[in-house]
């Protein structure tokens, strides 16, 4: 008789991770549920209505699901590591005039590194999450791979480009071939109490998505206002502080220029936010750092692929090529709107996730 494979399921208290646990249990795995405590509940739980993935409500919901499934359930403390790798990164990036993606940092350092390491120490064969992406092994590439989920609307491959081969080999994502409606239907049919729970659109550690207050509380010496300038260097008004702006932003500038005005550059060294017309926020080339590749070990020459510059956009034809030590130059066939330093650029070959990196700068803009 084959020995049951043991799986540690990351349960956020939402419907996706609930159904992940249920499906794997049905498939015969030996399941244990776990919620990662990544933020101080005394700070996070501002009101009874807060249901973020690290709230006490989320822990209660995950425990209720575990009880329905009859599986063991634990809460593991990752608060110190999360503060260092995600929260401090989030704060530092904004104060450097960049726009961070904390979900990618969390996946890279917490879920698929620290949790997998802990799972191995506890004797588990795999970890599992409620992400929508297809993991597997390709004979063609002779590598473990990540592909887009069946449901384009829910595909989360963009935030998974940091995967290593070892991590893919020891991670299960059983929702890859389901739609969200189907997942809710499974949860309802199985009597899981999270079947109708709404999706959280917030940054999990920022209550009410009010990141301005969050940053203000963590600023050293306070957030300083400074000048809005146009491309000619003329002062147009006063901004409220570098961390409150992102490339392509139009709302909330408080400028009366007589035309639609957008943030086109942020200079943290001189505390200047440059604004201009929409035309100035389109670019065709960028430089990316901290690149990771999944389909191959290293990028050795130019490749024609598709690249995506933000989570909710679509991949667009591009050429990626090495650009100095550790950097990649991405040249798009068509101009991209508001290429934003700090965000991820992710590379695709059809449905395959090739890899990705962090946008450092745009090096050419549309004229």
UniProtKB/Swiss-Prot annotation:
Record's GO cellular component terms: cytoplasm
Enzyme nomenclature, EC number: 2.8.1.13
InterPro entries assigned to the protein according to its UniProt record, in alphabetical order: MnmA-like, MnmA-like_C, MnmA-like_central, MnmA-like_central_sf, Rossmann-like_a/b/a_fold
Family designation: Belongs to the MnmA/TRMU family.
Gene3D superfamilies: Adenine nucleotide alpha hydrolases-like domains, HUPs, Translation factors
Biological process, per Gene Ontology: tRNA wobble position uridine thiolation
Positions of the catalytic residues: 106, 204
Pfam families: tRNA_Me_trans, tRNA_Me_trans_C, tRNA_Me_trans_M
Cross-referenced CDD domains: MnmA_TRMU-like (cd01998)
Organism whose genome encodes this protein: Desulforamulus reducens (strain ATCC BAA-1160 / DSM 100696 / MI-1) (Desulfotomaculum reducens)
Reactions it catalyzes: S-sulfanyl-L-cysteinyl-[protein] + uridine(34) in tRNA + AH2 + ATP = 2-thiouridine(34) in tRNA + L-cysteinyl-[protein] + A + AMP + diphosphate + H(+)
Cystines in this chain: 106-204
Keywords: ATP-binding, Cytoplasm, Disulfide bond, Nucleotide-binding, RNA-binding, Transferase, tRNA processing, tRNA-binding
SUPFAM superfamilies, A to Z: Adenine nucleotide alpha hydrolases-like (SSF52402)
Name of protein: tRNA-specific 2-thiouridylase MnmA
Binding site for ATP: 10-17, 36, 130
Subcellular location(s) of the protein: Cytoplasm
UniProt site (Interaction with tRNA): 131, 343
GO molecular function, one term: tRNA-uridine 2-sulfurtransferase activity
Record-linked PANTHER family: MITOCHONDRIAL TRNA-SPECIFIC 2-THIOURIDYLASE 1, TRNA 5-METHYLAMINOMETHYL-2-THIOURIDYLATE -METHYLTRANSFERASE
Span list, region Interaction with tRNA: 154-156, 310-311
């Amino acid at each position: 008789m084959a020995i049951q494979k043991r799986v540690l399921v990351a349960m956020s208290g939402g419907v996706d991770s609930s159904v992940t646990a249920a499906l794997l249990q049905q498939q015969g795995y030996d399941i244990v549920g776990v919620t990662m405590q990544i933020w101080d509940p005394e700070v996070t739980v501002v009101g009874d209505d807060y249901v973020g993935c690290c709230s006490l409500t989320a822990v209660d919901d995950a425990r209720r699901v575990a009880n329905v499934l009859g599986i063991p359930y634990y809460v593991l403390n990752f608060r110190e590591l999360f503060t260092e790798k995600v929260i401090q990164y989030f704060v530092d990036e904004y104060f450097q005039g960049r726009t961070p993606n904390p979900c990618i940092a969390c996946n890279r350092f917490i879920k698929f590194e620290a949790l997998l390491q802990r799972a191995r120490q506890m004797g588990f064969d795999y970890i599992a999450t409620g992400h929508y992406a297809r993991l597997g092994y390709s004979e063609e590439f002779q590598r473990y791979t990540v592909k887009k989920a069946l449901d384009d609307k829910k595909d989360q491959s963009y935030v998974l480009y940091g995967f290593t081969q070892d991590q893919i080999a020891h991670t299960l994502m059983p929702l890859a071939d389901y739609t969200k409606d189907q997942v809710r239907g499974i949860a309802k049919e199985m009597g899981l109490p999270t079947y109708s729970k709404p999706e959280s659109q917030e940054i999990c550690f920022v209550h009410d998505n009010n990141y301005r207050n969050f940053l203000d509380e963590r600023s050293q010496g306070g957030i300083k206002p400074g000048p809005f300038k146009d491309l000619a260097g003329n002062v147009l008004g006063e901004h409220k502080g570098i961390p409150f702006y992102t490339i392509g932003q139009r709302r909330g500038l408080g400028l009366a220029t007589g035309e639609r005005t957008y943030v086109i550059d942020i200079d943290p060294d001189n505390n200047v936010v440059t604004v201009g017309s929409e035309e100035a926020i389109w670019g065709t080339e960028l430089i990316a750092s901290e690149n990771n590749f999944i389909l191959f070990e290293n990028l050795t020459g130019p490749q024609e692929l598709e690249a995506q510059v933000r989570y909710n956009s679509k991949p667009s034809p591009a050429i990626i090529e090495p650009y100095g030590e550790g950097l990649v130059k991405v040249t798009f066939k068509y101009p991209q709107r508001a290429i934003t330093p700090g965000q991820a650029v992710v590379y695709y070959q059809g449905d395959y996730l090739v890899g990705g990196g962090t946008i450092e700068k745009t090096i050419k803009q549309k004229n």
